[in-house]
Amino acid sequence: MGEGHMIDCKPDKADRVDAAGLQAFVSRIISDHAGKEIIYLCIGTDRSTGDSLGPLVGSLLEERGVAGVMGTLRIPCDANTLPRLAQTLPDDAIIVAIDACLGRAESVGLFLASRGPLVPARSVNGGFGAIGTYSIAGVVNENSLKPYWTLQSTSLYRVMRMAGEIADAIASAVARQASQYFKSNAERMGAYE
């Protein structure tokens, strides 16, 4: 169970997007999969500033009442728990993997959005397989020869801002989808009265 979500393949090419582009990307996912279970797999740890993006997003989503969140500051989806959690993912669920990454200087503060999986801990040679139906990687800092140190010394302000942008995009898309669902149900019920 869940094994189909963790595969050893090269992820699809990701699009580099800002907060508005991320909003459009997430809205498409939610509208394309209306009625299906969507799990937001927020990968990372609360023990590294740069790598806390995923758990921060998970906590913000939980606070906003978004269902299907795995990985928060309280219960992170980190190197120790990811393999076990991946096995519990339902085979028919849509998985949106969310993680921090290092990248080019011009990409810092932006997001890599992909209609395919991401490889957790790639910049630090974590050895994980790809995971996710879709993925969002937040470029929290510039890639360097010392990725662990770079993640540790990443700006908390930047990480928190980016986590807020991801959570805002998801929460507002979920709310819009719910509103459309209730509106169409109300119209349908009104048509039968």
Short names for language-model regions:
Residues 1-193:
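N-terminal catalytic or cofactor-binding beta/alpha core of small enzyme domains
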